[in-house]
Amino acid sequence: EAGEECDCGSPENPCCDAATCKLRPGAQCAEGLCCDQCKFMKEGTVCRARGDDVNDYCNGISAGCPRNPFH
C-alpha cells in the first residue's frame, strides 16, 4: 500500500516494523526470493532453479527474483 516499505504482518518480523510498515534500521528488504536476513542476496545467487532451462539469478539490488531474459 502507499507509504509502506514492507508488509505489516507479524510483529516478530525482524526486518519490518509492524507498527509503521517501514523497514527496520539497517534492513534492505523484508521478504522476497532474493532477501535473506533483511539483506539483498549477492548478485549471481540462484533464486529460481529451472532444471534443464536457464536459472534465474538475484541482481544484488532488489529482493525480487528477476526473470532471466533468455527464457
Curated annotation (Swiss-Prot):
This is Disintegrin applaggin. A motif (Cell attachment site) lies at residues 50-52. It comes from Agkistrodon piscivorus piscivorus. Monomer (disintegrin). Residues 1-71 form the Disintegrin domain. The disintegrin belongs to the medium disintegrin subfamily. Transmembrane segments: none annotated. Expressed by the venom gland. SUPFAM superfamilies: Blood coagulation inhibitor (disintegrin) (SSF57552). Its main location: secreted. Keywords: Cell adhesion impairing toxin, Disulfide bond, Hemostasis impairing toxin, Platelet aggregation inhibiting toxin, Secreted, Toxin. Disulfide bonds join 6-21, 8-16, 15-38, 29-35, 34-58, 47-65. Inhibits fibrinogen interaction with platelets. Acts by binding to alpha-IIb/beta-3 (ITGA2B/ITGB3) on the platelet surface and inhibits aggregation induced by ADP, thrombin, platelet-activating factor and collagen. GO terms for cellular component: extracellular region. It is found in: Secreted. Belongs to the venom metalloproteinase (M12B) family. P-II subfamily. P-IIa sub-subfamily. The keyword Transferase does not apply.
